[in-house]
Every structure is written in C-alpha cells, then in structure tokens.
Amino acid sequence: MIKPKNILFAWFWLTCTLTHAQLTMPRATSTYWRDSVPEAMRQSYISYGAQYIGQPWATIPDSIFGEFRRNGNRTHYEQLCFQKRTQLAAVAMAEIIEGKGRFIPDLKAGLDNLLAEPWWGIPAHYGPAQPKQKDQTVDLFNAETAGLVAWIRYMLNEALGHDMQ
C-alpha cells in the first residue's frame, strides 16, 4: 500500500538524485527540436506560426477593458487578449522548431506589444477601484502571461538578443 510518507520520500529522493541537466528543458538552440520532434508535427507548428508573419498585434482599448464594469461584457476583451497570446505562442513555437530567425521580428513586436499592456489580467478579475493593500492575490491570467513571457525568454534568449532583456 502506498502511503503519503512513501510518496514524499520518493519525491525527495528523485529531486535529490536528478541532475540539473535532467530537469532542464532544451532551449531553442538545442538539436532536440529538430531531431526528436516528428517532421509532421514540426511542419504543423511552423505553418501555424507562419500565418502570423507580418500580421498586426492587437491593441486592447481601455473602452473594451471597461465594458465589464459598464455592462458585464467580458468576451470582447477576452477575445483580443487570448488571440494576442495565441499569436505570440504560435510565433515563438514556430521559431523554436524552425530555428532560422524568420519569426524573430514578429516575436519581438509581439513581446513589445504585450509588455506595453497596463495589466495582464481579465477585467472580471480586476477587483475594486482601490485594491486593499492586504489583498495580495495573484491573478491567474497575470501569472499565465508572465509564464509565457518567461518561457519565451528562456527558450529564445540568444535569438532575441540584448535589446529584449
């Protein structure tokens, strides 16, 4: 019978015995992405990302953000927000898989656009106009966007260069 203490021991043992290299995701420069990912899957990622080359990056007007407060509509904001993040992830993944630099200009433009947003959350999660100092919650969508940016920086750090740090 598996007991909680056995699970904790196994987790502790594994984390102590695995090397850093075994826990590290291969970066975009690794041959893993071109050698280990099946060709059909690679082509799918590349063609999905290619549809966004040269496409504009959505800017979300304050009026759309404010719709939730005015009339309860959150879908207009969410459509623009999710589309932008989908576009960014698609371009990033295409560059990781292809590795030729073709997606880098669009990726930089998308990161600039995303980093210029005043808030990464969803209007329905914004809370009162004057948040309480003791209320230190982390919004799920803020964290998800931060994770996306961190993942892109980790994977494509060299390709993005110093101007994106």
Which residues are covered by each model-predicted region?
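Acidic, low-complexity intrinsically disordered regions
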Residues: 7-9, 28-29, 53, 115-116, ...
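Low-complexity, Ser/Thr/Pro/Gly-enriched N-terminal "stalk/linker" regions
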Residues: 23-69
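Short, functional N-terminal and low-complexity linear motifs
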Residues: 53-60, 73-74, 113, 140, ...
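Short secondary-structure junctions and interdomain/linker hinges
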Residues: 15, 52-60, 98, 117-121
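Aromatic-lined, polymer-binding surfaces characteristic
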Residues: 78-165
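Bacterial Sec-dependent N-terminal signal peptides
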Residues: 1-22
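Short glycine/proline-rich turn/loop motifs
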Residues: 67-73, 129
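Short, N-terminal intrinsically disordered low-complexity segments that are rich in Pro/Gly
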Residues: 35-38, 77-81
